[in-house]
Amino acid sequence: MTVDHSKIPSITPSPLDGAPALEPLVSRCRIVDFPKIEDARGNLTFIEGDRHVDFGIKRVYYLYDVPGGAERGGHAHKGLHQLLIAMSGSFDVVVDDGRHRQRFHLNRSYYGLYIPPMIWREIDNFSSGSVCMVLASEYYDESDYYRDQDEFKAAAGA
C-alpha cells in the first residue's frame, strides 16, 4: 500500500509577508490517469482500488440523463474520498475549499478527478448523453454530507 502524500498539506512561502502558508486544500484535487490498453478491436481501461486510486472502492454510482442546464453535486463530504470519471460525453466539476475554487473539464474515460474530503463540489455543463461515474471510499452515509455551503465554510474555517 502506498502512502497518500496528498493528505499532508505542503508549506509554501506566503507571497504577502514571507511567512509560511498552507497550500490551498483545493490543490489536493487532481487528475488521475488510468492505464489505457489500445487495440484495433477497441480500447480497455481499468481502475484498481488502492493501486490507481489512494483508497479502497466501496461504492460505485453514476449520473446520467442529466437535463440540459442542470447542476449536480452541491455538497461536500466530511470523510469520503471520491473519483469522478466522464464515461461518456463531458461535464465540468467546480471544486471549492471555502477559500479557493478551481474548475476541471472532464471528457475522457481514461482519466478522472480525485476529490478528497472537505471539498465542496458542483457539477455542471453536462453534454447531451454524458455519463459521470463516481468511485467512493465509503458506503452511503447521510451524516458524512455538508449540504449547506455556509455550514461547510464554517467547518472548513473559511
Where are these regions (language model features)?
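Non-catalytic, conserved peripheral segments adjacent to functional cores
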Residues: 2-111, 128-129, 134-135, 140-158
